[in-house]
Amino acid sequence: EESNKYEASRILQDVGNKTVVVNPPYPPMTQGELDRSFDLPYTRMPHPKYKGKRIPAFDMIKFSVNLHRGCFGGCAFCTISAHQGKFIVSRSKESILKEVKAITEMPDFKGYLSDLGGPSANMYAMRGKEEKICRRCKRPSCIHPKVCPNLNTDHRPLLDIYHSVDALPGIKKSFIGSGVRSVSYT
């Protein structure tokens, strides 16, 4: 239950003569903080210890762009909300386009983005209409068993990103390779 809260409490559990302490996660980043984290000088290359070996997982993500952090799906089998939180923090359009432009300049880029998504691709820019309601909420999922009436499910910001990326010089096609979740009221 604590992992579903915006501001969780520390959990203490006695085990024998010791106490296990689980500290609460940091609050979600701001968009500016997230953008700055993506502005760091990443090489987009595997660790040097692989010395030219093929890494199948790297092939899959080499030309991918992460649009946001977090997932409000609350799927029982998944740990994204435990690692990134259930509250979506999205990168700015400018930050995303800057990264895509950098990818188009990579020597082996052929014009195809393998994934323009995130933990759950279509949750970009979605959040509660009234944050104070979200801060009190303990539900593990904002979409199951029913979509929360406080959830903004507007896909237009995401569609704008898709159209803007596809219009860039050097982009032939972009794909959505990460999970798409149903966030509609139907």
Residue ranges: model-predicted function:
Residues 1-61:
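Flexible, acidic/Gly-rich N-terminal and inter-domain linker regions that tether
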Residues 51-79, 112:
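N-terminal pre-triad scaffold of radical SAM enzymes
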Residues 82, 127-141, 149:
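Short secondary-structure boundary/capping segments
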Residues 82-112, 163-164, 168:
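Conserved alpha-helical substructure of the radical SAM core
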Residues 93-100, 141-163:
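Phosphate/diphosphate-binding loops
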Residues 104-135:
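Terminal amphipathic helices with adjacent charged low-complexity linkers/tails
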Residues 112, 173-175:
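Structural preference for beta-strand elements that scaffold enzyme active sites
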Residues 185-186:
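Conserved small/polar residues in nucleotide/adenosyl-binding loops
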